[in-house]
Amino acid sequence: MRALTIYSDTDATAPRWQSHEGDAIQRELNAIGVRFERWQTDRELGANPDADTVIAAYQDAIDRLVAEKGYQSWDVISMRPDNPQRETLRTKFLAEHTHGEDEVRFLVEGAGLFCLHVQGKIYQILCEKNDLISVPAGTAHWFDMGEAPSFTAIRVFDNPEGWIARFTGDAIADEYPRLVR
């Protein structure tokens, strides 16, 4: 179940606010400039769909984002527990970083924990199937895919080169709860 938990960035032990309610989550995230919404598809993707199948199922929604925001490229990332790079990628994604562009992700299946460091608070957003999140450019954040990741996501980019991170060097991510599934 999707969820939002908000902490102070000085106290990882006591959540200040928490909700599983979609409208409340959207309201809190919109207040800090984060887009959060649900997408639907009427296509059955089947087990382990390839990237072309995933893109085709959501092409209309992708086209709307491109028209609205001018994004230039998109791709599909799939991660499974047997991926030999999962530990390396998890370590990289868990390091607090920013991007020079919005980080736009749509969860086709599975789940991931986006953690945003904004205005003295940590916003932990558990995104699941059909959740779209767009983190504004320059927002310090990290992503936890869990120890045994199992997800497929569409990534949308301003920059045709794809995912380019600027690591902050802050170890704050180590202090906050991780994704447990």
Curated annotation (Swiss-Prot):
User: Binding positions for Ni(2+)?
Assistant: 97, 99, 103, 141
Name the positions where Fe(2+) binds.
97, 99, 103, 141
Q: Where is this site: Important to generate the dianion?
A: 105
Record-listed E.C. numbers: 1.13.11.54, 1.13.11.53
- Give me the reactions it catalyses: 1,2-dihydroxy-5-(methylsulfanyl)pent-1-en-3-one + O2 = 3-(methylsulfanyl)propanoate + CO + formate + 2 H(+); 1,2-dihydroxy-5-(methylsulfanyl)pent-1-en-3-one + O2 = 4-methylsulfanyl-2-oxobutanoate + formate + 2 H(+)
User: Site May play a role in transmitting local conformational changes: which residues?
Assistant: 102
GO BP terms: namely:
L-methionine salvage from methylthioadenosine; L-methionine salvage from S-adenosylmethionine
Give the record's cofactor note, including how many are bound: Binds 1 Fe(2+) cation per monomer. Binds 1 nickel ion per monomer.
A GO term for molecular function: acireductone dioxygenase (Ni2+-requiring) activity
**Record-linked CDD domains:** cupin_ARD
Q: In which pathway does it act?
A: Amino-acid biosynthesis; L-methionine biosynthesis via salvage pathway; L-methionine from S-methyl-5-thio-alpha-D-ribose 1-phosphate: step 5/6
* Cross-referenced InterPro entries: ARD (IPR004313), ARD_bac (IPR023956), RmlC-like_jellyroll (IPR014710), RmlC_Cupin_sf (IPR011051)
Keyword annotations for this protein? Amino-acid biosynthesis, Dioxygenase, Iron, Metal-binding, Methionine biosynthesis, Nickel, Oxidoreductase
* Pfam families to which the protein is assigned, alphabetical: ARD
Q: Which cofactor is essential here? A: Fe(2+); Ni(2+)
Enumerate the residues marked as the site May play a role in metal incorporation in vivo: 96
Assembly and oligomerization: Monomer.
Q: What is this protein's function?
A: Catalyzes 2 different reactions between oxygen and the acireductone 1,2-dihydroxy-3-keto-5-methylthiopentene (DHK-MTPene) depending upon the metal bound in the active site. Fe-containing acireductone dioxygenase (Fe-ARD) produces formate and 2-keto-4-methylthiobutyrate (KMTB), the alpha-ketoacid precursor of methionine in the methionine recycle pathway. Ni-containing acireductone dioxygenase (Ni-ARD) produces methylthiopropionate, carbon monoxide and formate, and does not lie on the methionine recycle pathway.
Q: Which PANTHER family match?
A: ACIREDUCTONE DIOXYGENASE
What family name appears in the similarity comment?
Answer: Belongs to the acireductone dioxygenase (ARD) family.
What is this protein's record name? Acireductone dioxygenase
Which species?
A: Sodalis glossinidius (strain morsitans)
